[in-house]
């Protein structure tokens, strides 16, 4: 899991920084000057070496952009100052994009931008990732490429990643059950107070990725792309809680065979391969897969009893078994009662 640390607590001698030194003359001096500033990092739990580093900086409308061509017009921006991820197959880049978007929301910026070289494979891979999530090439800052991402509330159903994390309240909304055994494994940011963060330290692709996979055999109704999912961790009258909001990116029914199904699910699903095979072989009626983007974890969890009191659920027997439709008003009730920051929702 990423940690937020002051520069002064990060080992500048780590080999991780060698390429940054090569690319930026004076990197060490800049780093030491930032002693009290904070950066986001992840560390390899086996050897203590750095795997990723991210430094963010807020900029006002009066910022001088004369060293960027064409010059950026005045806006409130979030600058992705230093961003490096070692490719280890665990989707750390996506994990850090989530941090970037969360900071952009919190600071109510108009735009995010990043300056990046395209000399190395890891940089080209990062550029490709940024482009997948809506960053577009703007111009140059010396030899560095500049990419910008508009951050005004907007939702493009045909390409949800390009307008992530914004979602419209006018979409259909479903409550979806998820068993306790799988809940925090798939949605680690929604960890319960009763669970130990130490159990979720290791890197797995399904934990880090914004894009995740939910395998289902539920009868209709089924959601469609752009619909909102509210995840409900099962556990009975007092212990069942709504924890998380996601948005449906894609539904897939038409797998050629078992291996096609496994390949599609592998990186975004909490299930190991043998469990996925078991699910496929269980019945002649094959499962379908909902690919969704994780949006937000509720700061305050409300349980089944409260959902019944609020008339979101009609009673104990109304607990979601498949995709349970709720109204937009009921979603607003959940957002209010969970004390959520709703700045990612377009009303």
What would you call each of these model-derived segments?
Residues 219-235:
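Short coil-to-beta transition motif at edge beta-strands of beta-rich domains
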Residues 1-43, 180-204:
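Short amphipathic alpha-helix that is part of the acyltransferase structural core
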Residues 61, 249-257:
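Short, conserved beta-turn/loop elements at beta-strand boundaries and strand-helix junctions
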């Amino acid at each position: 899991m990423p940690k937020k640390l002051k520069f002064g607590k990060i080992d500048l001698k780590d080999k991780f920084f060698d390429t940054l030194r090569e690319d930026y003359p004076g990197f060490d001096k800049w780093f030491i000057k930032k002693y009290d500033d904070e950066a986001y990092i992840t560390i390899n739990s086996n050897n203590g070496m750095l795997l990723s580093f991210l430094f963010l900086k807020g900029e006002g409308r009066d910022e001088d952009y004369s060293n960027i061509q064409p010059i950026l017009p005045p806006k409130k921006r979030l600058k992705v100052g230093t961003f490096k991820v070692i490719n280890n197959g665990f989707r750390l880049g996506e994990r850090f994009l989530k941090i970037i978007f969360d900071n952009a929301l919190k600071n109510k910026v108009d735009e995010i931008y990043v300056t990046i070289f395209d000399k190395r494979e890891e940089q080209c891979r990062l550029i490709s990732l940024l482009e997948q999530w809506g960053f577009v090439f703007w111009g140059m800052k010396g030899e560095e490429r500049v990419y910008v991402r508009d951050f005004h509330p907007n939702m493009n159903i045909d390409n949800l990643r390009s307008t992530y994390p914004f979602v419209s309240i006018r979409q259909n909304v479903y409550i979806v059950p998820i068993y306790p055994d799988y809940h925090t494994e798939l949605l680690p940011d929604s960890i319960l107070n009763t669970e130990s963060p130490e159990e979720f330290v290791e890197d797995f692709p399904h934990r880090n990725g914004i894009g995740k996979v939910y395998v289902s055999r539920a009868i209709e109704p089924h959601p469609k792309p752009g619909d909102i999912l509210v995840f409900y961790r099962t556990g009975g009258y007092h212990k069942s809680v709504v924890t998380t909001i996601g948005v449906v990116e894609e539904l897939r029914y038409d797998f050629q065979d078992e291996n096609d199904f496994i390949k599609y699910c592998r990186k975004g699903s909490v299930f190991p391969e043998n469990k996925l095979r078991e699910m496929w072989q269980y019945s002649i009626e094959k499962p379908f897969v909902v690919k969704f983007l994780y949006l937000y974890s509720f700061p305050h969890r409300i349980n089944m009893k409260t959902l019944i009191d609020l008339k979101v659920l009609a009673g104990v027997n109304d607990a979601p078994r498949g995709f349970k439709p709720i109204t937009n008003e009921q979603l607003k009730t959940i957002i209010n009662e969970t004390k959520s920051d709703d700045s990612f929702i377009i009303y």
